[in-house]
C-alpha cells in the first residue's frame, strides 16, 4: 500500500510538472511587507519632458524620492500615442510609434541601479483605449504592441538589477467592464495575453492599476469587479484612490477600499498576489486637467485611510514629480506638500 501511495504521489507530481508550460517560470512575487509599513514607498513617473534627462538629473530626482522613504518607481509607460505624442522612450524598432527617444529608459535604469530604486516598467499605451475598452480586436492588437515592447525591453534590460517588475498601463474600471463577460474578454484577450508572455520572458511580477467612480459604481460593484479582474495572471493589483480625480469623497473612501479588499481576498479565494494603494496627490477644482498639488491635510487623510486597510501592503503615489518634487512645475504648492509630508514622516518615525 505504501508503494502504491508513493506511486500515486509521484505520478501526480509528474503530471503537475508537465502541465506547466516549461518556458514559463513562476512569477517572482514581491517580498512580504515589513513589520512596520512606511507611508509612501513608491511613486509613478511619466517620461514626458524627460526625454533628454541626463543620468545626473535622474540621480537628483531618485535621491529626492529616496530621501522621503520611497524605494519603488513605476514608469507609467515606455511607449505612448495620442494626438499630441507618438513616442517610445528607449531604442526600439517598433513601427507603431513615430519618435524614438533612444536613451531615456537606459539612463533612468542606470541611475536607479546606483540609487537602489526598484523599477517597474510600463508598456505601450494608445490613448484611444478609452473608446475601445471592450473592443476585442483592438485589445488584441494593443496586446501585441505591448508584447513587442516587452520583448525589446527584456532583450536590452532584462538582467538590469533595477528592473523589478512590469506594469500594464491600461486602467480598468467596473463601469466599463460591467459584466462578467466583459471582464473575461479584457482578461483573456488582453491582460493574460500580455502577462503570460511576460512570464515567459522572465519571472518578474506584473501589475495593473484599477479605478472606479463612486457616482457610477457602488462598493459592491467594485468588490465583484476586483474579484473578476484578479482572476487574471497578475501579481500586483493596485487601486487608484480616486480622491484627486474627485471620483470619491474622503468620507466614502474606506468603504471602497474595504470592498476591493473583499473582492481580492474573499470573493476570489484564489488570488495569490498583493494589493497596493495608488494614492492621488493631485487636485483640481473639478477633478479634471489642469491639476496641481493637493494640500497635505487631504493627503494625510488619504494615507491614514489606506493604512487602515489590512491587506494594503504598499502605498505608491501618483505622482511625486508634479506634486512634490523640487522640480515640479507647481513649485510653491509642491514644496509645501513635500515639506509637510517630510515633517509628518519624521514625527511618525520618532514614535
Short names for language-model regions:
Residues 51-65, 146-156, 218-229, 294-306:
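Short, acidic/polar
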Residues 15-37:
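Bacterial Sec-dependent N-terminal signal peptides
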Residues 99-115, 135-165, 190, 197, ...:
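An active-site-proximal structural segment forming one wall of the substrate-binding cleft
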Residues 57-67, 71-128, 182-208, 252-259:
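Aromatic-lined substrate-binding rim segments of carbohydrate-active enzymes
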Residues 120-132, 140, 164-171, 190-222, ...:
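Aromatic-lined carbohydrate-recognition surfaces of secreted/lumenal glycan-active proteins
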Residues 46-59, 77-84, 90-103, 129, ...:
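Acidic-and-aromatic substrate-binding clefts and catalytic sites of carbohydrate-active enzymes
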Amino acid at each position: 500500500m505504501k508503494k502504491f501511495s508513493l506511486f500515486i504521489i509521484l505520478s501526480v507530481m509528474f503530471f503537475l510538472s508537465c502541465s506547466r508550460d516549461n518556458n514559463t517560470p513562476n512569477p517572482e512575487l514581491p517580498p512580504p511587507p515589513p513589520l512596520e509599513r512606511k507611508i509612501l514607498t513608491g511613486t509613478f513617473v511619466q517620461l514626458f519632458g524627460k526625454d533628454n534627462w541626463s543620468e545626473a538629473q535622474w540621480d537628483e530626482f531618485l535621491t529626492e524620492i529616496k530621501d522621503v522613504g520611497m524605494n519603488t518607481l513605476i514608469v507609467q509607460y515606455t511607449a505612448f500615442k495620442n494626438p499630441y505624442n507618438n513616442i517610445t522612450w528607449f531604442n526600439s524598432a517598433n513601427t507603431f510609434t513615430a519618435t524614438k527617444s533612444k536613451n531615456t529608459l537606459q539612463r533612468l535604469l542606470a541611475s536607479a541601479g546606483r540609487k537602489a530604486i526598484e523599477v517597474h516598467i510600463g508598456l505601450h499605451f494608445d490613448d484611444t483605449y478609452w473608446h475601445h475598452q471592450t473592443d476585442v480586436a483592438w485589445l488584441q492588437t494593443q496586446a501585441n504592441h505591448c508584447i513587442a515592447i516587452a520583448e525589446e525591453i527584456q532583450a536590452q534590460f532584462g538582467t538590469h538589477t533595477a528592473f523589478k517588475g512590469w506594469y500594464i498601463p491600461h486602467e480598468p474600471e467596473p463601469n466599463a467592464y460591467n459584466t462578467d463577460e466583459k471582464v473575461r474578454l479584457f482578461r483573456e484577450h488582453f491582460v493574460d495575453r500580455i502577462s503570460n508572455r511576460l512570464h515567459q520572458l522572465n519571472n518578474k511580477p506584473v501589475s495593473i492599476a484599477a479605478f472606479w467612480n463612486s457616482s457610477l459604481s457602488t462598493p459592491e460593484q467594485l468588490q465583484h469587479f476586483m474579484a473578476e479582474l484578479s482572476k487574471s495572471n497578475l501579481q500586483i493589483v493596485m487601486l487608484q484612490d480616486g480622491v484627486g480625480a474627485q471620483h470619491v469623497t474622503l468620507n466614502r473612501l474606506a468603504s471602497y477600499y474595504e470592498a476591493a479588499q473583499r473582492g481580492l481576498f474573499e470573493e476570489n479565494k484564489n488570488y495569490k498576489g498583493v494589493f497596493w494603494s495608488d494614492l492621488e496627490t493631485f487636485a483640481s477644482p473639478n477633478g479634471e486637467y489642469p491639476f496641481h498639488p493637493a494640500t497635505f491635510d487631504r493627503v494625510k487623510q488619504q494615507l491614514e485611510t489606506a493604512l487602515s486597510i489590512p491587506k494594503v501592503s504598499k502605498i505608491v503615489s501618483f505622482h511625486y514629480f508634479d506634486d512634490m518634487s523640487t522640480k515640479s512645475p507647481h513649485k510653491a504648492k509642491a514644496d509645501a506638500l513635500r515639506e509637510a509630508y517630510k515633517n509628518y514622516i519624521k514625527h511618525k518615525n520618532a514614535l
